[in-house]
UniProtKB/Swiss-Prot annotation:
Biological processes, Gene Ontology terms: photorespiration; reductive pentose-phosphate cycle
GO terms, molecular function: magnesium ion binding; monooxygenase activity; ribulose-bisphosphate carboxylase activity
PTM info: The disulfide bond which can form in the large chain dimeric partners within the hexadecamer appears to be associated with oxidative stress and protein turnover.
UniProt record similarity statement: Belongs to the RuBisCO large chain family. Type I subfamily.
Proregion span(s): 1-2
Compartments (UniProt record): Plastid, Chloroplast
Alphabetical list of PROSITE patterns matching this protein: RUBISCO_LARGE
Site (Transition state stabilizer): K334
Additional note from the record: The basic functional RuBisCO is composed of a large chain homodimer in a 'head-to-tail' conformation. In form I RuBisCO this homodimer is arranged in a barrel-like tetramer with the small subunits forming a tetrameric 'cap' on each end of the 'barrel'.
Organism of derivation: Liriodendron tulipifera
Protein name per UniProt: Ribulose bisphosphate carboxylase large chain
Gene3D superfamilies named in the record: Ribulose bisphosphate carboxylase, large subunit, C-terminal domain (3.20.20.110), RuBisCO large subunit, N-terminal domain (3.30.70.150)
Length: 476
C-alpha cells in the first residue's frame, strides 16, 4: 500500500492513510511471557512487500484499521497493538512467508476461545492485500491458559472412571450413520459393546431426525450399554451426541443423558461453536460426564496448505474450550493425516509441555501448566490390519475407533468387536514383550488369528484394503 499525503486536521491529528509497517512492523520487539504469539503463512499480492503484509496482519487482527482515526489519541496503541516481530521465507515456495505476530494479553477476554479467534482469525483473512493467509500455530501463555477450565476431566480421571489401564481404548461408530430406527440402533450398540469394545458412538450428523428422535436413541442406547455391562463386567459407554440447533436444546439433551446415568456425551465443536462447546464442557465437569468431541467441518478450515487454520491450532483451542476426546486422524486410514504433523498435534493434546519442533510443525514451545489432557481418537477407514501401526503410532493414551471395521465383519457386529479386541490385546502384549510392532505387525495379527476365528475372518475380508495410494495435502 503506497502512503498517501497526510493532512493536518484542525482537531490536532494527522489524518490520512499510512503504511502499516510504519506502526506494526517492529523487528526489534522482544516478546513477553504474557504475549499470545502467532505464526502465519502469508502469501502477499504481487507488489506487496512482506514487511507490509506482515504488519497488515498484525494491524487488522488487533487495533488497526485502514486509515488514521482521531480516537487513536484516546488510548495507548503501543500497549494494545499487535506487532509483526519476525518474518522468514518459506523454503521451496516463492512469495510465501512465515510471519510472527505478538499480541498483548489485554486484547482478549478471559476464558473465551470465541473472542480469541474473533480477533486473530477474523476479518484479516479477507484482506485484499493478501492472496492467502494461514494460521500455522499459536503460543498460548500460561497466564491466559489459567483462565480456562479446559477438558472436563482429562486422561487420568477418565481411566479411573472406566477402570481401564495399559492399553488404548476401543470404539465403534454405528453405521449406517443415518436411517436406522432407535431400537435397531440400540441393538447394534449392544452387540458391539458385548463383543469387547469400550465405546460406541453416534456419528457427527446424528442429532434428532424424523427416523430417530434423540430421546428415543438415548433411551435405547442406555439400555444397551447397561445390558452389555452386566454381561461383560466392564464399564461401557456410548457417545450420545448432544449437538443441537440451540444451546438450550443441547443442554437439555446433556441433562437427560446425566439422568440416564451414562458416562459420556458428545459434541460437534466446530459446527456447534466454541461458546456452546465451552458451556457443555463446564456442565460435564460439574456433573461427572465425559465429553467426546467430533471435528466435523475441520477440513474446510485446515486442509489447504496456504489458507485457513492448521488443525494444531484447532486442537489447542479445543483443549482450552474443553473436551476429553477429539478426533485426530489416523495416519494410516482413509482420512488426511501425515505422520509427523499428526503426532505433533497429538502431543499438544496430551502432554503438559511440548518443545518447539519445526520438523513436526510445532512453531512454539507450549506449557499447558497442568491443564488436563485430551485423548486423541483415531477413526476413519481403519481395520484389524491397521491395529499394530495404530498401537505403535498413538500409544496407550488414545481411542482407536473402528466403524466399518467392526460392523463390516462378515459374521456380524459382535464378532467384529471380538476381532478388534483380540487384535488390540495381541498388539499390546507383543509390544510389552519387546516386539517391534512396525516391522512385525502383520505377523503378530496372523499369530493371534490362529486362536480367534473372528479375527481370522476379519483378516480375510480386509487383507487387500489400503488407503496409502493418496498423498497427504498438508505437508511441512
Amino acid at each position: 500500500m503506497s502512503p498517501q499525503t497526510e493532512t493536518k486536521a484542525s482537531v490536532g491529528f494527522k489524518a490520512g492513510v499510512k503504511e502499516y509497517k510504519l506502526t506494526y512492523y517492529t523487528p526489534e520487539y522482544e516478546t513477553k511471557d504474557t504475549d499470545i504469539l502467532a505464526a502465519f503463512r502469508v502469501t502477499p499480492q504481487l507488489g506487496v512487500p512482506p514487511e507490509e503484509a506482515g504488519a497488515a496482519v498484525a494491524a487488522e487482527s488487533s487495533t488497526g484499521t485502514w486509515t488514521t482515526v482521531w480516537t487513536d489519541g484516546l488510548t495507548s496503541l503501543d500497549r494494545y497493538k499487535g506487532r509483526c516481530y519476525h518474518i522468514e521465507p518459506v523454503a521451496g515456495e516463492t512469495d510465501q512467508y512465515i510471519v510472527y505476530v505478538a499480541y498483548p494479553l489485554d486484547l482478549f477476554e478471559e476464558g473465551s476461545v470465541t473472542n480469541m479467534f474473533t480477533s486473530i482469525v477474523g476479518n484479516v483473512f479477507g484482506f485484499k492485500a493478501l492472496r492467502a493467509l494461514r494460521l500455522e500455530d499459536l503460543r498460548i501463555p500460561p497466564a491466559y491458559i489459567k483462565t480456562f477450565q479446559g477438558p472436563p476431566h482429562g486422561i487420568q480421571v477418565e481411566r479411573d472412571k472406566l477402570n481401564k489401564y495399559g492399553r488404548p481404548l476401543l470404539g465403534c461408530t454405528i453405521k449406517p450413520k443415518l436411517g436406522l430406527s432407535a431400537k435397531n440402533y440400540g441393538r447394534a450398540v449392544y452387540e458391539c459393546l458385548r463383543g469387547g469394545l469400550d465405546f460406541t458412538k453416534d456419528d457427527e450428523n446424528v442429532n434428532s431426525q424424523p427416523f430417530m428422535r434423540w430421546r428415543d436413541r438415548f433411551l435405547f442406547c442406555a439400555e444397551a450399554l447397561y445390558k452389555a455391562q452386566s454381561e461383560t463386567g466392564e464399564i461401557k459407554g456410548h457417545y450420545l451426541n448432544a449437538t443441537a440447533g440451540t444451546c438450550e436444546e443441547m443442554m437439555k439433551r446433556a441433562v437427560f443423558a446425566r439422568e440416564l446415568g451414562v458416562p459420556i456425551v458428545m459434541h460437534d465443536y466446530l459446527t456447534g461453536g466454541f461458546t456452546a462447546n465451552t458451556s457443555l464442557a463446564h456442565y460435564c465437569r460439574d456433573n461427572g460426564l465425559l465429553l467426546h468431541i467430533h471435528r466435523a467441518m475441520h477440513a474446510v478450515i485446515d486442509r489447504q496448505k496456504n489458507h485457513g487454520i492448521h488443525f494444531r491450532v484447532l486442537a489447542k483451542a479445543l483443549r482450552m474450550s474443553g473436551g476429553d476426546h477429539i478426533h485426530s486422524g489416523t495416519v494410516v486410514g482413509k482420512l488426511e493425516g501425515e505422520r509427523d504433523i499428526t503426532l505433533g498435534f497429538v502431543d499438544l493434546l496430551r502432554d503438559d509441555f511440548i518443545e518447539k519442533d519445526r520438523s513436526r510443525g510445532i512453531y512454539f514451545s507450549q506449557d499447558w501448566v497442568s491443564l488436563p489432557g485430551v485423548l486423541p481418537v483415531a477413526s476413519g477407514g481403519i481395520h484389524v490390519w491397521h491395529m499394530p501401526a495404530l498401537t505403535e503410532i498413538f500409544g496407550d493414551d488414545s481411542v482407536l475407533q473402528f466403524g466399518g471395521g467392526t460392523l463390516g465383519h462378515p459374521w456380524g457386529n459382535a464378532p467384529g468387536a471380538v476381532a478388534n479386541r483380540v487384535a488390540l490385546e495381541a498388539c499390546v502384549q507383543a509390544r510389552n514383550e519387546g516386539r517391534d510392532l512396525a516391522s512385525q505387525g502383520n505377523e503378530i495379527i496372523r499369530e493371534a488369528s490362529k486362536w480367534s476365528p473372528e479375527l481370522a475372518a476379519a483378516c480375510e475380508v480386509w487383507k487387500e484394503i489400503k488407503f496409502d495410494s493418496f498423498k497427504a495435502m498438508d505437508t511441512l
